[in-house]
């Protein structure tokens, strides 16, 4: 389960509910959205109830099954509660207005969607432009890479993306191969080769956006957390096109990750082997193997109590780069878990964003 916040739920966190003795309500992950469906267990018919460009985070039904309260995420605003009335017209309306005052006090853009061709796939991507965007100017680019790996970005309001856009960055985020929501073959494309073809997809997306003419190719930055941190490490060890990078709660050594993470054993399903039987395979797909090729200035952010991606992953990478006299900085957050960015102590969550902005601004 991926913690909700700046990422679309990819493993269905909402339990399916019976509306009647025959009709089952459920959500799925589909191309950046999280639609709500009704399934009739007798006829096998599937009926969409909510299938627009939005995400049903969770829902609750009235006793008679005629009304459904929906926790809905949209790109235009932070989440609110909506009411779906299953009368003859299927009326859907918002019933909370928790963020209206806040939204009226800020200036932000809605992300623009792109479908970018890459190796054997078309990659759904979004670009969030700064407020007051001027197409004649050249802006710095920030590539954001999601975790998972089998997760997805989508149709939600991302506070983190808005922070960077407000600071003057064009923010690019994509669902490369390995993401969920596009079928089994798409999600399984990285099986046995974690960084590929995701690397090609990410670079294709950057190339595509650069061709649009409003990004400065000399001012490109990259960041990501968890698997996104793994990919950040991989990207900067295989290209020098980025001026700076921030890797968060990341993985650099798959062999040690297998033995120290609370879910490390799950790598066997992806690599069809274990590190003590096939050390070369795990070494091949570990970014630290290629650390000598890293020249991009790197800031490593990690939580000391991270059980998913233990802090030793950050320490390994930091020591290796420091030993090689590479430009690297390590920032550790005490008492925090893998979910610092989404559920950490509020002042530390703010400090994390400030650190990232500082890191990118210094180099821009």
Describe each model-derived feature in a short phrase.
Residues 1-15, 20, 29, 39-57, ...:
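Multi-bladed beta-propeller domains
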Residues 24-25, 68-69:
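Hydrophobic beta-strand positions that form the internal "hydrophobic ladder"
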Residues 90, 96-218, 225, 257-266:
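Cap/lid segment of the alpha/beta-hydrolase catalytic domain
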Residues 173-364:
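Active-site-proximal cap/loop segments of hydrolase catalytic domains
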């Amino acid at each position: 389960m991926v913690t909700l916040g700046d990422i679309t739920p990819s493993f269905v966190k909402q339990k399916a509910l019976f509306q009647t003795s025959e009709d089952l309500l459920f959500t799925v992950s589909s191309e950046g959205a999280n639609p709500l469906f009704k399934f009739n267990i007798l006829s096998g018919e599937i009926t969409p109830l909510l299938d627009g460009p939005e995400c049903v985070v969770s829902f609750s039904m009235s006793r008679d099954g005629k009304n459904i309260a929906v926790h809905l995420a949209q790109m235009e605003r932070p989440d609110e509660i909506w009411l779906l009335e299953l009368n003859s017209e299927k009326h859907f309306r918002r019933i909370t207005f928790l963020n209206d005052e806040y939204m009226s006090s800020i200036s932000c853009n809605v992300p623009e969607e792109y479908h970018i061709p890459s190796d054997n796939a078309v990659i759904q991507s979004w670009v969030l432009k700064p407020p007051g965007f001027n197409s004649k100017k050249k802006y710095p680019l920030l590539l954001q890479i999601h975790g998972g790996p089998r997760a997805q970005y989508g149709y939600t309001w991302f506070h983190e993306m808005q922070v960077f856009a407000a600071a003057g960055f064009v923010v690019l985020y994509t669902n490369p191969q390995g993401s969920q929501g596009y079928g089994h073959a798409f999600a399984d494309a990285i099986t046995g080769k974690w960084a590929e073809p995701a690397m090609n997809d990410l670079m294709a997306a950057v190339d595509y956006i650069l061709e649009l003419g409003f990004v400065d190719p000399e001012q490109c930055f990259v960041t990501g957390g968890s698997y996104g941190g793994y990919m950040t490490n991989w990207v900067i060890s295989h290209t020098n096109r980025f001026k700076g990078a921030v890797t968060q709660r990341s993985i650099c050594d798959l062999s040690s990750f297998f033995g120290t993470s609370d879910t490390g054993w799950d790598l066997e399903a992806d690599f069809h082997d274990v590190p003590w039987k096939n050390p070369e395979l795990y070494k091949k797909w570990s970014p630290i193997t290629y650390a000598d090729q890293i020249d991009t200035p790197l800031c490593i952010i990690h939580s000391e109590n991270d059980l998913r991606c233990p802090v030793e992953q950050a320490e390994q990478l930091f020591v290796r780069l420091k030993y090689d006299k590479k430009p690297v900085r390590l920032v550790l957050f005490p008492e925090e878990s893998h979910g610092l960015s989404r559920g950490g102590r509020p002042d530390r969550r703010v400090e994390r964003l400030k650190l990232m902005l500082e890191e990118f601004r210094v180099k821009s």
